[in-house]
């Protein structure tokens, strides 16, 4: 924070944040404590892979499963009818000892990448990270914190600037690797053991 005083100053002068997709829709949610209780009530420990197929049938649309961290779960997701999966350790905030998502990406792509789309979430902080994931077979990446920092400090302009930074970093890295088309980037641009 000391290295980014202007960002801190902007954060101090933004309006209070709320959970806009929950406030007004969930009963008795008025503060973080009640939100935590409500969130805990939304999880059913009895859910199984059989339920995924049933949910897909009821839903009738595309089904994406987030939170996959093993090739075994990836195979179960594919067998259950998922259209895509997202490798995610939820930023490590749920389980501090979880593997990094990029470490498990190659094994999961090898197991199911020809059957369903594989995306990656968690740990993306630069355009170079995005390029590494694409080189290892991910269809794309998801990014949360970087956009939230930009949004918090500068609103929509901050999000736009974040996108520009990530794009420019990825574009520059591709150029250094001798590529102009992200669809043609493969593992050959990576030094084994550096991801």
Where are the regions a protein language model picked out?
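Glycine-rich, proline-tolerant flexible connector loops at the mouths of alpha/beta enzymes
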Residues: 36, 89-99, 148-152
